[in-house]
Protein backbone atom coordinates (compact mmCIF):
# COMPACT_ATOMS: atom_id res chain seq x y z
CA UNK A 1 0.00 0.00 0.00
CA UNK A 2 2.81 2.36 0.89
CA UNK A 3 4.57 1.52 -2.35
CA UNK A 4 1.40 2.12 -4.39
CA UNK A 5 0.79 5.45 -2.66
CA UNK A 6 4.35 6.54 -3.32
CA UNK A 7 4.13 5.57 -6.99
CA UNK A 8 0.81 7.40 -7.34
CA UNK A 9 2.33 10.53 -5.78
CA UNK A 10 5.32 10.41 -8.14
CA UNK A 11 3.05 9.95 -11.14
CA UNK A 12 0.99 13.01 -10.17
CA UNK A 13 4.13 15.13 -9.75
CA UNK A 14 5.42 13.98 -13.14
CA UNK A 15 2.13 14.76 -14.88
CA UNK A 16 1.88 18.19 -13.29
CA UNK A 17 5.44 19.00 -14.30
CA UNK A 18 4.83 17.85 -17.87
CA UNK A 19 1.64 19.87 -18.14
CA UNK A 20 3.24 23.06 -16.87
CA UNK A 21 6.25 22.73 -19.14
CA UNK A 22 4.10 22.15 -22.23
CA UNK A 23 1.41 24.74 -21.53
CA UNK A 24 2.41 27.67 -23.75
CA UNK A 25 0.00 30.12 -22.14
CA UNK A 26 1.95 29.72 -18.90
CA UNK A 27 5.35 30.01 -20.57
CA UNK A 28 7.30 32.72 -18.83
CA UNK A 29 10.42 32.33 -20.97
CA UNK A 30 12.00 35.76 -21.16
CA UNK A 31 10.16 37.27 -18.20
CA UNK A 32 12.99 36.54 -15.79
CA UNK A 33 15.75 36.69 -18.43
CA UNK A 34 18.09 39.64 -18.42
CA UNK A 35 19.43 40.97 -21.70
CA UNK A 36 22.79 39.34 -21.00
CA UNK A 37 21.26 35.88 -21.42
CA UNK A 38 19.73 36.52 -24.86
CA UNK A 39 21.20 36.55 -28.36
CA UNK A 40 21.50 39.66 -30.52
CA UNK A 41 19.77 38.44 -33.68
CA UNK A 42 17.00 41.07 -33.50
CA UNK A 43 19.59 43.78 -34.11
CA UNK A 44 21.09 42.03 -37.12
CA UNK A 45 17.63 41.73 -38.67
CA UNK A 46 16.85 45.42 -38.24
CA UNK A 47 20.28 46.66 -39.31
CA UNK A 48 19.82 44.82 -42.60
CA UNK A 49 16.44 46.50 -43.14
CA UNK A 50 17.91 49.92 -42.39
CA UNK A 51 20.82 49.42 -44.76
CA UNK A 52 18.45 48.49 -47.57
CA UNK A 53 16.27 51.56 -47.04
CA UNK A 54 19.27 53.84 -46.59
CA UNK A 55 20.76 52.66 -49.88
CA UNK A 56 17.86 54.05 -51.92
CA UNK A 57 16.79 57.01 -49.74
CA UNK A 58 17.24 60.29 -51.60
CA UNK A 59 18.89 63.12 -49.62
CA UNK A 60 19.12 60.90 -46.55
CA UNK A 61 22.91 60.97 -46.67
CA UNK A 62 25.06 62.11 -45.04
CA UNK A 63 23.18 63.76 -42.12
CA UNK A 64 19.69 62.25 -41.77
CA UNK A 65 20.89 58.62 -41.84
CA UNK A 66 23.11 58.75 -38.73
CA UNK A 67 20.55 60.95 -36.99
CA UNK A 68 17.94 58.23 -37.51
CA UNK A 69 20.39 55.59 -36.28
CA UNK A 70 20.94 57.59 -33.10
CA UNK A 71 17.26 57.76 -32.21
CA UNK A 72 16.69 54.12 -33.17
CA UNK A 73 19.52 53.00 -30.92
CA UNK A 74 18.51 55.32 -28.08
CA UNK A 75 14.90 54.14 -28.13
CA UNK A 76 15.83 50.46 -27.98
CA UNK A 77 18.27 51.18 -25.16
CA UNK A 78 15.72 53.11 -23.07
CA UNK A 79 13.00 50.53 -23.70
CA UNK A 80 15.28 47.67 -22.59
CA UNK A 81 16.60 49.10 -19.33
CA UNK A 82 14.38 46.77 -17.32
CA UNK A 83 16.60 43.94 -18.52
CA UNK A 84 19.88 45.85 -18.06
CA UNK A 85 20.25 46.43 -14.31
CA UNK A 86 23.75 47.90 -14.57
CA UNK A 87 22.65 50.71 -16.89
CA UNK A 88 20.53 53.82 -16.46
CA UNK A 89 18.32 56.13 -18.47
CA UNK A 90 19.73 59.14 -20.32
CA UNK A 91 16.35 60.86 -20.14
CA UNK A 92 17.42 63.75 -17.93
CA UNK A 93 20.88 64.09 -19.45
CA UNK A 94 19.33 64.51 -22.90
CA UNK A 95 16.28 66.49 -21.78
CA UNK A 96 13.55 64.01 -22.73
CA UNK A 97 10.50 65.20 -20.82
CA UNK A 98 8.01 62.36 -21.08
CA UNK A 99 9.85 59.03 -21.05
CA UNK A 100 7.69 56.06 -19.95
CA UNK A 101 8.68 54.28 -16.75
CA UNK A 102 11.18 51.44 -16.92
CA UNK A 103 9.46 48.05 -17.02
CA UNK A 104 10.78 44.63 -16.12
CA UNK A 105 9.68 41.08 -16.92
CA UNK A 106 9.31 41.61 -20.66
CA UNK A 107 10.50 39.66 -23.67
CA UNK A 108 13.32 41.97 -24.73
CA UNK A 109 13.74 40.95 -28.38
CA UNK A 110 10.09 41.89 -28.97
CA UNK A 111 10.55 45.18 -27.11
CA UNK A 112 13.40 46.04 -29.49
CA UNK A 113 11.48 44.71 -32.50
CA UNK A 114 8.52 46.99 -31.77
CA UNK A 115 10.72 50.00 -31.08
CA UNK A 116 12.69 49.67 -34.32
CA UNK A 117 9.58 49.04 -36.41
CA UNK A 118 7.76 52.11 -35.11
CA UNK A 119 10.66 54.53 -35.43
CA UNK A 120 11.99 53.24 -38.74
CA UNK A 121 8.56 53.78 -40.26
CA UNK A 122 8.50 57.32 -38.90
CA UNK A 123 11.94 58.19 -40.22
CA UNK A 124 11.31 56.84 -43.73
CA UNK A 125 7.61 57.54 -44.31
CA UNK A 126 8.30 60.90 -46.03
CA UNK A 127 11.43 59.80 -47.92
CA UNK A 128 11.67 59.50 -51.70
CA UNK A 129 13.44 56.34 -52.84
CA UNK A 130 15.47 56.27 -56.06
CA UNK A 131 17.55 53.74 -57.96
CA UNK A 132 21.08 54.45 -59.16
CA UNK A 133 19.74 56.01 -62.35
CA UNK A 134 17.56 58.46 -60.45
CA UNK A 135 14.26 56.70 -61.12
CA UNK A 136 11.72 57.03 -58.30
CA UNK A 137 10.86 53.70 -56.68
CA UNK A 138 7.74 52.59 -54.84
CA UNK A 139 7.80 54.00 -51.32
CA UNK A 140 5.27 51.44 -50.14
CA UNK A 141 7.54 48.58 -51.17
CA UNK A 142 10.22 49.92 -48.85
CA UNK A 143 7.84 50.62 -45.97
CA UNK A 144 6.54 47.07 -46.37
CA UNK A 145 10.03 45.81 -45.58
CA UNK A 146 9.54 47.29 -42.12
CA UNK A 147 6.03 45.91 -41.65
CA UNK A 148 7.00 42.44 -42.81
CA UNK A 149 10.12 42.29 -40.67
CA UNK A 150 8.21 43.23 -37.53
CA UNK A 151 5.58 40.56 -38.21
CA UNK A 152 8.18 37.95 -39.09
CA UNK A 153 10.08 38.45 -35.86
CA UNK A 154 7.00 38.53 -33.65
CA UNK A 155 5.83 35.27 -35.22
CA UNK A 156 9.23 33.76 -34.49
CA UNK A 157 9.08 34.91 -30.88
CA UNK A 158 5.80 33.07 -30.33
CA UNK A 159 7.95 29.97 -29.98
CA UNK A 160 9.60 31.49 -26.91
CA UNK A 161 6.97 33.58 -25.15
CA UNK A 162 3.23 33.75 -24.56
CA UNK A 163 0.99 36.03 -26.60
CA UNK A 164 0.27 38.12 -23.52
CA UNK A 165 3.96 38.59 -22.81
CA UNK A 166 4.68 39.49 -26.43
CA UNK A 167 1.83 42.00 -26.53
CA UNK A 168 3.01 43.65 -23.31
CA UNK A 169 6.55 43.78 -24.68
CA UNK A 170 5.38 45.25 -27.98
CA UNK A 171 3.32 47.88 -26.18
CA UNK A 172 6.27 49.01 -24.08
CA UNK A 173 8.63 49.14 -27.06
CA UNK A 174 6.16 51.28 -29.00
CA UNK A 175 5.43 53.52 -26.02
CA UNK A 176 9.10 54.35 -25.56
CA UNK A 177 9.59 54.75 -29.33
CA UNK A 178 6.68 57.19 -29.44
CA UNK A 179 8.31 59.30 -26.72
CA UNK A 180 11.63 59.23 -28.58
CA UNK A 181 9.88 60.26 -31.79
CA UNK A 182 8.35 63.26 -30.01
CA UNK A 183 11.84 64.13 -28.83
CA UNK A 184 13.20 63.76 -32.37
CA UNK A 185 10.65 66.04 -34.01
CA UNK A 186 11.31 68.74 -31.40
CA UNK A 187 14.66 69.30 -33.16
CA UNK A 188 13.62 71.94 -35.73
CA UNK A 189 16.74 71.68 -37.90
CA UNK A 190 17.18 67.93 -37.97
CA UNK A 191 13.56 66.81 -38.31
CA UNK A 192 12.64 66.10 -41.95
CA UNK A 193 15.74 67.94 -43.18
CA UNK A 194 15.83 65.63 -46.20
CA UNK A 195 12.77 67.50 -47.52
CA UNK A 196 14.81 70.71 -47.80
CA UNK A 197 18.41 69.56 -48.28
CA UNK A 198 19.71 72.86 -49.69
CA UNK A 199 18.26 75.26 -47.10
CA UNK A 200 20.25 78.50 -47.40
CA UNK A 201 22.59 80.20 -49.88
CA UNK A 202 26.33 79.93 -49.36
CA UNK A 203 28.11 83.10 -50.44
CA UNK A 204 31.61 82.17 -51.58
CA UNK A 205 34.32 84.80 -51.30
CA UNK A 206 37.81 84.51 -52.74
CA UNK A 207 38.68 80.84 -53.04
CA UNK A 208 35.99 79.49 -50.73
CA UNK A 209 33.88 76.50 -51.70
CA UNK A 210 31.60 76.65 -54.71
CA UNK A 211 29.40 73.80 -56.03
CA UNK A 212 31.21 71.60 -58.55
CA UNK A 213 28.63 68.95 -59.43
CA UNK A 214 25.49 69.13 -61.59
CA UNK A 215 22.92 68.20 -58.91
CA UNK A 216 23.76 71.06 -56.55
CA UNK A 217 21.69 74.22 -56.48
CA UNK A 218 23.97 76.88 -57.96
CA UNK A 219 24.59 78.88 -54.78
CA UNK A 220 23.72 76.33 -52.09
CA UNK A 221 25.43 73.47 -50.31
CA UNK A 222 23.91 70.22 -49.12
CA UNK A 223 22.74 70.39 -45.48
CA UNK A 224 24.46 73.72 -44.84
CA UNK A 225 22.52 74.05 -41.55
CA UNK A 226 23.46 70.63 -40.20
CA UNK A 227 25.85 72.12 -37.66
CA UNK A 228 22.75 73.30 -35.77
CA UNK A 229 21.18 69.84 -35.44
CA UNK A 230 20.65 68.55 -31.89
CA UNK A 231 23.72 66.92 -30.38
CA UNK A 232 23.81 64.03 -27.92
CA UNK A 233 27.26 64.41 -26.39
CA UNK A 234 29.41 66.93 -28.27
CA UNK A 235 29.53 70.42 -26.74
CA UNK A 236 29.72 73.83 -28.40
CA UNK A 237 33.33 73.99 -27.29
CA UNK A 238 33.95 70.70 -29.08
CA UNK A 239 32.44 72.09 -32.27
CA UNK A 240 34.97 74.92 -32.22
CA UNK A 241 37.95 72.80 -31.16
CA UNK A 242 39.06 71.90 -34.70
CA UNK A 243 42.09 73.88 -35.85
CA UNK A 244 41.76 76.18 -38.85
CA UNK A 245 42.65 74.65 -42.23
CA UNK A 246 45.56 75.77 -44.35
CA UNK A 247 44.66 78.98 -46.12
CA UNK A 248 44.21 79.30 -49.84
CA UNK A 249 47.48 80.23 -51.52
CA UNK A 250 48.67 79.94 -55.12
CA UNK A 251 52.35 79.86 -54.11
CA UNK A 252 53.86 76.55 -55.20
CA UNK A 253 55.75 76.46 -51.89
CA UNK A 254 52.58 76.79 -49.79
CA UNK A 255 51.17 73.95 -47.72
CA UNK A 256 47.82 74.00 -49.50
CA UNK A 257 49.54 73.73 -52.88
CA UNK A 258 51.50 70.70 -51.62
CA UNK A 259 48.31 69.09 -50.34
CA UNK A 260 46.44 69.72 -53.58
CA UNK A 261 49.38 68.38 -55.56
CA UNK A 262 49.40 65.21 -53.44
CA UNK A 263 45.72 64.65 -54.26
CA UNK A 264 46.46 65.33 -57.93
CA UNK A 265 49.29 62.76 -58.02
CA UNK A 266 47.47 60.07 -56.03
CA UNK A 267 44.31 60.49 -58.11
CA UNK A 268 46.25 60.08 -61.35
CA UNK A 269 47.97 56.98 -59.98
CA UNK A 270 44.56 55.46 -59.33
CA UNK A 271 43.40 56.52 -62.79
CA UNK A 272 46.38 54.84 -64.49
CA UNK A 273 45.72 51.52 -62.72
CA UNK A 274 41.95 50.97 -62.82
CA UNK A 275 42.38 47.48 -61.36
CA UNK A 276 45.06 48.50 -58.85
CA UNK A 277 44.92 48.90 -55.08
CA UNK A 278 44.40 52.68 -55.10
CA UNK A 279 41.34 52.38 -57.31
CA UNK A 280 40.03 49.43 -55.30
CA UNK A 281 40.39 51.48 -52.12
CA UNK A 282 38.56 54.45 -53.64
CA UNK A 283 35.66 52.37 -54.92
CA UNK A 284 35.46 50.18 -51.83
CA UNK A 285 34.96 53.09 -49.43
CA UNK A 286 33.05 55.53 -51.63
CA UNK A 287 29.40 54.84 -50.70
CA UNK A 288 28.55 58.21 -52.26
CA UNK A 289 25.86 57.26 -54.75
CA UNK A 290 22.19 56.83 -53.89
CA UNK A 291 20.90 53.53 -55.22
CA UNK A 292 24.36 51.95 -55.31
CA UNK A 293 25.26 51.34 -51.68
CA UNK A 294 24.25 52.40 -48.20
CA UNK A 295 25.66 55.73 -47.01
CA UNK A 296 29.13 56.38 -45.49
CA UNK A 297 27.88 56.67 -41.88
CA UNK A 298 25.67 53.60 -42.24
CA UNK A 299 28.81 51.74 -43.38
CA UNK A 300 30.03 51.88 -39.78
CA UNK A 301 26.73 50.41 -38.62
CA UNK A 302 27.26 47.56 -41.11
CA UNK A 303 30.75 47.01 -39.72
CA UNK A 304 29.35 46.98 -36.18
CA UNK A 305 26.79 44.39 -37.27
CA UNK A 306 29.52 42.16 -38.65
CA UNK A 307 31.55 42.42 -35.43
CA UNK A 308 28.54 41.82 -33.17
CA UNK A 309 27.75 38.65 -35.13
CA UNK A 310 31.32 37.37 -35.31
CA UNK A 311 31.94 37.96 -31.60
CA UNK A 312 28.50 36.70 -30.60
CA UNK A 313 27.73 39.70 -28.40
CA UNK A 314 24.83 39.12 -26.04
CA UNK A 315 21.74 41.30 -26.37
CA UNK A 316 22.75 43.75 -23.63
CA UNK A 317 26.17 44.41 -25.15
CA UNK A 318 24.68 44.79 -28.62
CA UNK A 319 22.01 47.17 -27.34
CA UNK A 320 24.67 49.37 -25.78
CA UNK A 321 26.83 49.20 -28.92
CA UNK A 322 24.08 50.45 -31.23
CA UNK A 323 22.97 53.17 -28.83
CA UNK A 324 26.52 54.48 -28.59
CA UNK A 325 27.58 54.14 -32.22
CA UNK A 326 24.33 55.72 -33.43
CA UNK A 327 24.86 58.76 -31.22
CA UNK A 328 28.52 58.99 -32.22
CA UNK A 329 27.73 58.90 -35.94
CA UNK A 330 24.98 61.50 -35.51
CA UNK A 331 27.18 63.87 -33.53
CA UNK A 332 29.98 63.22 -36.04
CA UNK A 333 27.75 64.59 -38.79
CA UNK A 334 27.00 67.68 -36.71
CA UNK A 335 30.60 68.51 -35.79
CA UNK A 336 31.79 67.79 -39.32
CA UNK A 337 29.16 69.85 -41.13
CA UNK A 338 29.47 72.66 -38.60
CA UNK A 339 33.13 73.01 -39.55
CA UNK A 340 32.60 72.43 -43.25
CA UNK A 341 30.45 75.54 -43.48
CA UNK A 342 32.43 77.42 -40.84
CA UNK A 343 35.56 77.28 -43.00
CA UNK A 344 34.07 76.79 -46.51
CA UNK A 345 37.22 75.19 -47.93
CA UNK A 346 37.04 74.66 -51.68
CA UNK A 347 37.32 71.16 -53.08
CA UNK A 348 40.62 69.96 -54.57
CA UNK A 349 39.17 69.91 -58.08
CA UNK A 350 38.59 73.67 -57.95
CA UNK A 351 42.09 74.43 -56.68
CA UNK A 352 43.79 71.93 -58.99
CA UNK A 353 42.01 73.18 -62.11
CA UNK A 354 42.92 76.76 -61.22
CA UNK A 355 46.53 76.27 -60.06
CA UNK A 356 47.85 72.92 -61.36
CA UNK A 357 45.96 71.32 -64.26
CA UNK A 358 42.86 72.88 -65.85
CA UNK A 359 41.93 69.51 -67.41
CA UNK A 360 41.84 67.61 -64.11
CA UNK A 361 38.72 65.47 -63.58
CA UNK A 362 37.40 63.12 -60.91
CA UNK A 363 37.94 59.44 -61.83
CA UNK A 364 35.31 56.72 -61.33
CA UNK A 365 32.93 58.72 -59.12
CA UNK A 366 32.82 61.54 -61.65
CA UNK A 367 31.79 64.31 -59.23
CA UNK A 368 32.65 65.85 -55.89
CA UNK A 369 30.10 65.82 -53.05
CA UNK A 370 28.05 69.05 -52.87
CA UNK A 371 29.53 70.61 -49.74
CA UNK A 372 32.88 72.04 -48.59
CA UNK A 373 35.97 69.89 -48.11
CA UNK A 374 37.24 70.45 -44.56
CA UNK A 375 36.96 68.21 -42.58
CA UNK A 376 36.20 64.99 -44.43
CA UNK A 377 32.86 63.37 -43.66
CA UNK A 378 34.19 59.89 -44.41
CA UNK A 379 37.09 60.45 -42.04
CA UNK A 380 34.90 61.86 -39.27
CA UNK A 381 32.38 59.01 -39.51
CA UNK A 382 35.13 56.39 -39.69
CA UNK A 383 37.00 57.57 -36.61
CA UNK A 384 33.80 58.20 -34.63
CA UNK A 385 32.52 54.71 -35.39
CA UNK A 386 35.86 53.03 -34.77
CA UNK A 387 36.28 55.00 -31.54
CA UNK A 388 33.11 53.32 -30.25
CA UNK A 389 33.94 49.88 -31.63
CA UNK A 390 37.37 49.90 -29.98
CA UNK A 391 35.65 50.29 -26.61
CA UNK A 392 34.02 46.89 -27.26
CA UNK A 393 36.79 44.88 -28.95
CA UNK A 394 40.01 46.74 -28.22
CA UNK A 395 42.53 48.69 -30.27
CA UNK A 396 44.28 45.71 -31.87
CA UNK A 397 41.24 43.91 -33.24
CA UNK A 398 41.95 42.44 -36.74
CA UNK A 399 39.05 42.85 -39.11
CA UNK A 400 38.07 41.97 -42.68
CA UNK A 401 35.33 44.11 -44.20
CA UNK A 402 32.90 42.03 -46.28
CA UNK A 403 30.33 44.81 -46.79
CA UNK A 404 30.51 44.79 -50.60
CA UNK A 405 31.79 41.31 -51.36
CA UNK A 406 28.85 40.39 -53.61
CA UNK A 407 29.11 43.48 -55.81
CA UNK A 408 30.03 43.18 -59.48
CA UNK A 409 29.34 46.77 -60.58
CA UNK A 410 32.44 47.95 -58.71
CA UNK A 411 35.36 46.34 -56.91
CA UNK A 412 33.86 45.21 -53.62
CA UNK A 413 36.41 42.49 -52.88
CA UNK A 414 36.87 42.27 -49.07
CA UNK A 415 39.76 44.18 -47.53
CA UNK A 416 41.59 43.08 -44.37
CA UNK A 417 43.07 45.24 -41.60
CA UNK A 418 45.32 44.58 -38.61
CA UNK A 419 43.19 46.88 -36.48
CA UNK A 420 40.05 48.98 -36.66
CA UNK A 421 42.20 52.10 -36.54
CA UNK A 422 43.90 50.90 -39.73
CA UNK A 423 40.44 50.53 -41.25
CA UNK A 424 39.53 54.10 -40.28
CA UNK A 425 42.78 55.44 -41.69
CA UNK A 426 42.23 53.72 -45.02
CA UNK A 427 38.61 54.87 -45.17
CA UNK A 428 39.80 58.45 -44.64
CA UNK A 429 42.72 58.20 -47.07
CA UNK A 430 40.53 56.63 -49.79
CA UNK A 431 39.11 60.07 -50.58
CA UNK A 432 42.47 61.20 -51.96
CA UNK A 433 42.70 58.69 -54.85
CA UNK A 434 39.06 59.50 -55.52
CA UNK A 435 40.16 63.13 -55.95
CA UNK A 436 37.68 64.76 -53.58
CA UNK A 437 39.77 65.62 -50.48
CA UNK A 438 43.05 66.99 -49.20
CA UNK A 439 45.10 65.24 -46.53
CA UNK A 440 44.17 67.99 -44.05
CA UNK A 441 40.52 66.95 -44.47
CA UNK A 442 41.48 63.42 -43.45
CA UNK A 443 43.38 64.75 -40.41
CA UNK A 444 40.54 67.06 -39.40
CA UNK A 445 38.06 64.21 -39.59
CA UNK A 446 40.35 62.07 -37.45
CA UNK A 447 40.30 64.72 -34.73
CA UNK A 448 36.54 65.32 -34.89
CA UNK A 449 35.65 61.63 -35.00
CA UNK A 450 37.80 60.52 -32.08
CA UNK A 451 36.62 63.49 -30.00
CA UNK A 452 33.00 62.61 -30.75
CA UNK A 453 33.42 58.96 -29.78
CA UNK A 454 35.12 59.97 -26.53
CA UNK A 455 32.24 62.30 -25.62
CA UNK A 456 29.62 59.63 -26.27
CA UNK A 457 31.51 57.10 -24.16
CA UNK A 458 31.67 59.67 -21.34
CA UNK A 459 27.88 59.91 -21.08
CA UNK A 460 26.50 58.42 -17.82
CA UNK A 461 25.54 55.02 -19.17
CA UNK A 462 26.34 53.01 -16.04
CA UNK A 463 24.55 53.27 -12.72
Where is each model-derived feature located?
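Hydrophobic helical h-region of N-terminal Sec-dependent signal peptides
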Residues: 9-16
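C-terminal motif of bacterial Sec signal peptides marking the signal peptidase cleavage site
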Residues: 18-21
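Bacterial N-terminal signal peptides that target proteins for export
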Residues: 1-9
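Acidic/polar surface patches and capping/hinge elements
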Residues: 23-463
